[in-house]
Amino acid sequence: MQLNPTEKDKLLLFTAGMVAERRKNRGVKLNYPESIAYISMLLMEGARDGKTVAQLMSEGATYLSANDVMEGIAEMIHDVQVEATFPDGTKLVTVHNPIV
């Protein structure tokens, strides 16, 4: 399988998101990179499922709570941005204050 650099980046981000999801499901509090990867993975999957940018921007703030992450992580993450592939092309999705 031949992947271009963008596809490799998306695959790596998705893989990191899957690891973070498994840890979250086991009750492990996520660190900074795991939190970013988890939110990004769900945004990319939502885009592939046909959700709109507006839907993902509002839903993205509900994926993680302060109880899901290590102490201080919620305050460190102000925005999460990911280029997601929608049925009509690639768009930038930005979620402000993603961890409440």
From Swiss-Prot:
Oligomeric and partner information: Heterotrimer of UreA (gamma), UreB (beta) and UreC (alpha) subunits. Three heterotrimers associate to form the active enzyme.
A GO cellular component entry from the record: cytoplasm
Family classification: Belongs to the urease gamma subunit family.
Gene3D superfamilies registered for this protein in UniProt: Urease, gamma-like subunit (3.30.280.10)
Highest taxon, organism lineage: Bacteria
Any one Pfam family match given in the protein's UniProt record, by short name: Urease_gamma
EC number: 3.5.1.5
Organism: Psychrobacter cryohalolentis (strain ATCC BAA-1226 / DSM 17306 / VKM B-2378 / K5)
MF terms in GO: nickel cation binding; urease activity
Main localisation: cytoplasm
Entry-linked InterPro entries: Urease_gamma (IPR012010), Urease_gamma/gamma-beta_su (IPR002026), Urease_gamma_sf (IPR036463), Urease_subunit (IPR050069)
GO biological process, one term: urea catabolic process
Localization (cell): Cytoplasm
Name assigned to this protein: Urease subunit gamma 2
Gene coding for it: ureA2
Keywords: Cytoplasm, Hydrolase
Reaction(s) the record says it catalyses: urea + 2 H2O + H(+) = hydrogencarbonate + 2 NH4(+)
Cited PANTHER family: UREASE
Pathway(s) served: Nitrogen metabolism; urea degradation; CO(2) and NH(3) from urea (urease route): step 1/1
